């Protein structure tokens, strides 16, 4: 099991859908979140992309010198740059970070945003172009280790003599992650990517996705790993966790939810449509309605695009729910919480000790419990209380 955190380049807050409690997200703050994730033992961080975010590659590059072991899951967007340019950027980043790059292929699902970026392909065409893009990207980087060039002719993209002179550290290329819920997305994942990511849906729905992608990959003679993108709201007790979930959306008003849902309806992303269906396009507003599966809460998706669900509960329950997903085949958990700095600490302190040994064995020594807390009086070293 791998556990990643999230760099909030689109903003951070204590509440959703309001400026109240908003936090200044500048470079100093992004560094704080990255250093916390690195220090606490998260294996990587996702850096999002889109017009609502700071540029992921610039942000990721700026975080190399302040981290030691943290890996960076950075987006590439087919259509915004040539695949060979993306390959050179990836190779350079991988070399400068000593092999810490992971690449997230993002096709895009908002026609308005895509049009603003000069992309006027429909859903099917975007996936065709994305398949050609990542094929050129992968094969160019693989060839770079031998000093070879690539010729490729496709429907949307073609290259002749494509070459990367300075190969990446990782062979044949940095691992490729990708998420999508349509049939076209599943086929692309099966044929081209290393890890398929799903947003946090109920376990039965996730199991169906895994089975479909796995079967498609087998037809291509490939195996694919699986990951899930979730928010987390964990507290020492269940009641405290659910109170925190209620507080997160306590400043929302009907107009804000309606405007968000209207924006989501204009998207042609199958994944976004599935997220919206979990809360009935904003109609569901009570805890009973929003808890769509035990401890899986759809409240975040009332106003947040993309990943819209959170695991809510005490440490033991959240760890148990993660195990349920792991038993389905999920091996990478990409997590986040509001605000991202404090919640990185809270999740690590409360849940990491309960996760499988494969996670605990990779944690930096004594980072979560010691060697001791604040000294009592002037010289008494505190001890761990008996359970």
From Swiss-Prot:
Keywords: Flavoprotein, FMN, Monooxygenase, Oxidoreductase. Its EC number is 1.14.14.5. GO terms for biological process: alkanesulfonate catabolic process. It comes from the Bacteria. It holds the Pfam family Bac_luciferase. InterPro entries: Alkanesulphonate_mOase_FMN-dep, Luciferase-like_dom, Luciferase-like_sf, SsuD_RutA_monooxygenase. Catalyzes the desulfonation of aliphatic sulfonates. The keyword Flavoprotein applies. Transmembrane segments: none annotated. This is Alkanesulfonate monooxygenase. The keyword NAD does not apply. Belongs to the SsuD family. It catalyses: an alkanesulfonate + FMNH2 + O2 = an aldehyde + FMN + sulfite + H2O + 2 H(+). One of its GO terms (molecular function) is alkanesulfonate monooxygenase activity. It is an enzyme of class 1 (oxidoreductase). NCBIfam families: alk_sulf_monoox (TIGR03565), PRK00719.1 (NF001939).
């Amino acid at each position: 099991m791998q556990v990643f955190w999230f760099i909030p380049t689109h903003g951070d807050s204590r509440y959703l859908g309001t400026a109240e409690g908003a936090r200044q997200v500048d470079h100093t703050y992004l560094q704080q979140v990255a250093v916390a994730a690195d220090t606490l033992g998260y294996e990587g961080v996702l850096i999002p992309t889109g017009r609502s975010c700071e540029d992921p590659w610039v942000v990721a590059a700026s975080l190399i010198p302040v981290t030691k072991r943290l890996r960076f899951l950075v987006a590439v967007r087919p259509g915004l740059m040539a695949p060979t340019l993306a390959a050179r950027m990836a190779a350079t980043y991988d070399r400068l970070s000593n092999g810490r790059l992971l690449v997230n292929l993002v096709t895009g699902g908002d026609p308005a945003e895509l049009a603003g970026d000069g992309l006027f392909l429909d859903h099917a065409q975007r996936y065709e172009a994305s398949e050609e893009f990542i094929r050129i990207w992968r094969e160019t980087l693989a060839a770079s280790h031998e000093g070879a060039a690539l010729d490729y002719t496709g429907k949307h993209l073609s290259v002749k003599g494509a070459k990367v002179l300075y190969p990446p550290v990782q062979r044949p290329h940095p691992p490729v992650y990708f998420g999508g819920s349509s049939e076209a997305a599943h086929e692309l994942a099966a044929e081209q990517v290393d890890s398929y990511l799903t947003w946090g849906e109920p376990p039965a729905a996730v199991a169906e996705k895994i089975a479909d992608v796995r079967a498609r990959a087998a037809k291509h003679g490939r195996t694919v790993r699986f990951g899930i993108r979730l928010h987390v709201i964990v507290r020492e007790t269940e009641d405290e966790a659910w109170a925190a979930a209620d507080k997160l959306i306590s400043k929302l008003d009907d107009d804000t939810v309606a405007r968000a849902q209207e924006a989501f309806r204009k998207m042609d992303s199958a994944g976004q449509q599935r997220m919206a269906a979990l809360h009935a396009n904003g109609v569901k507003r009570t805890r009973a309605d929003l808890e769509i599966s035990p401890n899986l809460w759809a409240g975040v998706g009332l106003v947040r695009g993309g990943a819209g669900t959170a695991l809510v509960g005490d440490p033991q329950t959240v760890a148990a729910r993660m195990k349920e997903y792991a038993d389905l085949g999920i091996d990478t958990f990409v997590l986040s919480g509001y605000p991202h700095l404090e919640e990185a600490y809270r999740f690590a302190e409360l849940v990491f000790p309960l996760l499988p040994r494969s996670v605990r064995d990779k944690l930096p020594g004594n980072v979560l419990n010691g060697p001791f807390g604040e000294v009592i009086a002037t010289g008494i070293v505190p001890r761990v209380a008996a359970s």
